[in-house]
Curated annotation (Swiss-Prot):
This is Cytochrome c oxidase subunit 2. Component of the cytochrome c oxidase (complex IV, CIV), a multisubunit enzyme composed of 14 subunits. The complex is composed of a catalytic core of 3 subunits MT-CO1, MT-CO2 and MT-CO3, encoded in the mitochondrial DNA, and 11 supernumerary subunits COX4I, COX5A, COX5B, COX6A, COX6B, COX6C, COX7A, COX7B, COX7C, COX8 and NDUFA4, which are encoded in the nuclear genome. Keywords: Copper, Electron transport, Magnesium, Membrane, Metal-binding, Mitochondrion, Mitochondrion inner membrane, Respiratory chain, Translocase, Transmembrane, Transmembrane helix, Transport. It comes from Halichoerus grypus (Gray seal). Mg(2+) binds at residue 198. One of its GO terms (cellular component) is mitochondrial inner membrane. The gene is MT-CO2.
Length: 227
């Protein structure tokens, strides 16, 4: 869950987001080491009186500053490619939900059910109940079973949108005429909030996303009540 003045990423709720957090820390450590080395060299050059250097033809130095950046890039690229392929891999999803972006709301269709679909609009500020979040609550939440692989098919009816839920590590563009897909799996129940992350018009800020992850038995009761 996000909180005011938050500096870091939200707590991970899915395996993919946990991998992304590890990769973020891994990359940040490399950037910190490089920055420290550069600052040290700059301070050394500013405080040392250089009277003679033989750097006009230093093959060893050129070899080092060619090979070392290549190694650093490989150390960053390999974990990144691994996570990228993990995010694209979808095998035998337990449930498929089709998401369509509109100006300015989302519509959802549970394709495994004959007639389970609804629109999801933001609740206006004046209609919020005590404890509800401004600009983040919706009239119809997306209820999904936890600890199950769920495929999200995402597209748009009008302009470019982007379906994003940070705590699950999800951000997929909704493009008119194109069907993108992503997968999600939540390891614990709860409410997970997101928003449209592509500027899509005057009410772009009023397209929240709310996922309610529940045990399978609760999801079955909910789906039965919706049919």
């Amino acid at each position: 869950m996000a909180y005011p003045l938050q500096m870091g990423l939200q707590d991970a709720t899915s395996p993919i987001m946990e991998e992304l957090l590890h990769f973020h820390d891994h990359t940040l450590m490399i950037v910190f080491l490089i920055s420290s080395l550069v600052l040290y060299i700059i301070s050394l050059m500013l405080t040392t009186k250089l009277t003679h250097t033989s750097t006009m033809d230093a093959q060893e130095v050129e070899t080092v500053w060619t090979i070392l950046p290549a190694i650093i890039l490989i150390l960053i690229a390999l974990p990144s490619l691994r996570i990228l392929y993990m995010m694209d891999e979808i095998n035998n999803p337990s449930l498929t939900v089709k998401t369509m972006g509109h100006q300015w709301y989302w519509s959802y269709e549970y394709t495994d059910y004959e007639d389970l679909n609804f629109d999801s609009y933001m609740i206006p500020t004046q209609e919020l109940k005590p404890g509800e979040l401004r600009l983040l609550e919706v009239d119809n939440r997306v209820v999904l079973p936890m600890e199950m692989t769920i495929r999200m098919l995402i597209s748009s009816e009008d302009v470019l949108h982007s379906w994003a839920v940070p705590s699950l590590g999800l951000k997929t563009d909704a493009i008119p005429g194109r069907l993108n897909q992503t997968t999600l799996m939540a390891m614990r129940p709860g409410l997970y909030y997101g928003q449209c992350s592509e500027i899509c018009g005057s009410n772009h800020s009023f397209m929240p996303i709310v996922l309610e992850l529940v045990p399978l038995s609760h999801f079955e009761k909910w789906s039965t009540s919706m049919l």
